[in-house]
Amino acid sequence: TIIMLAGLQGAGKTTLAGKLGYWLKDSGHTPLLVAADLQRPNAVTQLQVVGERAGVPVYAPEKGVQSDGGEAVAAPGQTSGDPVKVARDSIELAKQKLYDTVIIDTAGRLGVDEELMKQARDIRDAVRPNEILFVIDAMIGQDAVKTAKAFDEGVDFTGVVLSKLDG
């Protein structure tokens, strides 16, 4: 099973990836988290920490953008990497290592833009996920419908997760 997470930056995709991975592991599955957000500073590191806490392995072959003293810098020798290749390669690894569920954490933006949607579509087309979950902050307010429509048109999501409802 391949699950792709999509949504705006800060919506809770990375945290959901860890929670979902933990729940699946606890239910007897063998999940793999995939670090395909190579643009947000330290996103790969965050997913690695979340995966470690959940006891779920993380496929993170590229460092993505790192931050150094509060300033975003690219990892040595790369700008941010190729998230489509990371996602595609993770599926092959999952088949080889017998992971039964792959959870792909994708990049977000502060707002909807064509670059974000193109990257999400490219990942979707490369891995053909069973589920595309649109993750949205429950506190987003008036912008929720517009954002949901944009993601539905952009990646044709199959489910919605409202995040940050736990207090």
Listing of model-derived features with the role each one plays in the protein:
Residues 1-167:
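P-loop/Walker A NTP-binding module and the surrounding RecA-like catalytic core of P-loop NTPases
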